[in-house]
């Protein structure tokens, strides 16, 4: 993530406050259901990271506030995590679409789930409908395909220089399938691009 010069100077807070709808670290923290702490002089407050993004490049951040911390619960036994992105270049490129998925598996079923997606809305966002779909299911090909379809229907991307809205929806579906492939070795097929 990032070139060597950027990794030497950049901060996690800067990445989040940049408010990019496709920031890689933001996707990671959203999938981990992180909380953000803000400080202004002696005044402190915290809120879920998912509530920090109000609109395109708009944050719940007052003019003199600084990000003091970002935290999330330490994943326990049975926790799995994966991050995926599609970009034109393999390294050092801004994503067209990116996504992260955090799961907790118990007794062969998905006990908790949290997914995030970027490039598919004006803000980086969680995918609560997809997470709800996953809870209680076995991690198999049918579940992977259902999660991918749910994610695709849950987003409202716009067409821009990085791709059409339909293409971004397609990419998100493919990346959700990739999560299952990486975490469980599941080959769930691919989606075909929709044509009008």
Language-model features: where?
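C-terminal structural segment of proteins
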Residues: 1-196
């Amino acid at each position: 993530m990032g070139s060597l010069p950027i990794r030497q100077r950049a901060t996690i807070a800067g990445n989040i406050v940049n408010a990019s709808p496709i920031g890689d670290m933001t996707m990671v923290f959203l999938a981990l259901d992180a909380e953000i702490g803000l400080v202004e002089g002696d005044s402190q407050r915290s809120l879920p990271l998912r509530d920090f993004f109000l609109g395109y490049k708009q944050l719940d951040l007052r003019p003199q506030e600084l990000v003091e911390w970002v935290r999330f619960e330490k994943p326990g036994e049975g926790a799995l995590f994966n991050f995926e992105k599609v970009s034109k270049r393999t390294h050092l490129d801004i994503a067209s679409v990116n996504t992260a998925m955090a799961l907790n598996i118990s007794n062969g079923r998905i006990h908790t789930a949290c997914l995030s997606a970027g490039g598919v809305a004006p803000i980086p966002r969680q995918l609560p409908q997809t997470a709800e779909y996953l809870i209680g299911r076995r991690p198999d090909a049918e579940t992977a395909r259902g999660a991918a379809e749910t994610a695709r229907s849950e987003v409202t991307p716009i067409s821009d220089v990085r791709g059409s809205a339909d293409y971004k929806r397609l990419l998100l579906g493919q990346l959700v399938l990739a999560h299952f492939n990486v975490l469980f070795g599941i080959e769930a097929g691919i989606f075909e691009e929709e044509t009008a």
